Amino acid sequence: MTNLRKSHPLIKIINHSFIDLPAPSNISAWWNFGSLLGVCLMLQIITGLFLAMHYTADTTTAFSSVTHICRDVNYGWLIRYLHANGASMFFIFLYLHIGRGIYYGSFTFMETWNIGVLLLFAVMATAFMGYVLPWGQMSFWGATVITNLLSAIPYIGPTLVEWIWGGFSVDKATLTRFFAFHFILPFIITAMVMIHLLFLHETGSNNPSGLNSDSDKIPFHPYYTIKDILGLLFMILTLMTLVLFSPDLLGDPDNYTPANPLNTPPHIKPEWYFLFAYAILRSIPNKLGGVLALVFSILILMLFPALHLSKQRSMTFRPLSQCLLWILVANLIILTWIGGQPVEYPFITIGQLASVIYFSIILIFMPATSLMENKLLKW
């Protein structure tokens, strides 16, 4: 009799995805982030569901309901901080996952990569709307500033902004719809993740060498399931340390002040994981130009397959390209720092320089270096 996991129509799919899946024998810890992102998504959906049971999406009671969750609900503080810091973990893993994809040339799986970029946009949208829900000062002003960017779109801009707001300013209608979208989007993200995996399993995983690994495959279970569990333990350790010792480390103190449309905070800034894009937005004096730079700073990921001019897939044996990639990482850290600083000298200049370097490395230096490496290797 055939094993049930191989014959049952539903269990068979799970078997081919997580148990009998042939995986390259040499994939490193950099391949752990996919499963960690899946765990993060599940954690966010579960904690979010419990928060939604006690939260009220109304301007008069939203802030109080979050306070009530933290003070009166059994382990409400834990659920709330797991959800808030879980988002930070989510983005750390996302950026590491994308960085891995760039380093090892995983973007040559076009469908998987493009769905991944769309997933990034969806997660960013979800996180932004979630940040608005506690209805603190930074929630309100963050929502006002970011939604206002759409007014830079020629002709339809101002109408579009009022349509999104549901009125003439960020108010009750905005909060209600943001809650609705924040609730539904993670389920859409889950569906997209399944498509992401479907496309990945069409080609099989990439590996650190960037070479074809069909001749040397091992079953996913038990080798990589145990490896993923180790990664999961590290994640739980980090997340719980953050939640139990310094839950507000990554938050903004301004968000402990209830939203007040008559009082603007001195420095409006998003959560840390958006600061690099926010710095790029601010470094361009023109409103529309800034918005385009902001969108393109993420959308540029779509161009990686086209900009890949090297004869080798991975950067493993390309020291010059490696050097450029690490300069890009350092540059992104500088942009993140600048995004959290006030708009004054010397931060403006540093931000503009870092923005130019960011686009130059990706669009000019990396492809040029690839060609030079081909030449040096006489390919």
From Swiss-Prot:
Subcellular location(s) per record: Mitochondrion inner membrane
Residues reported to bind heme b b566: 97, 196
Membrane topology: Multi-pass membrane protein
Gene Ontology biological process: mitochondrial electron transport, ubiquinol to cytochrome c
Alphabetized Pfam families for the sequence: Cytochrom_B_C (PF00032), Cytochrome_B (PF00033)
UniProt KW Transmembrane keyword: yes
Cofactor binding, per record: Binds 2 heme b groups non-covalently.
Protein name as it appears in the record: Cytochrome b
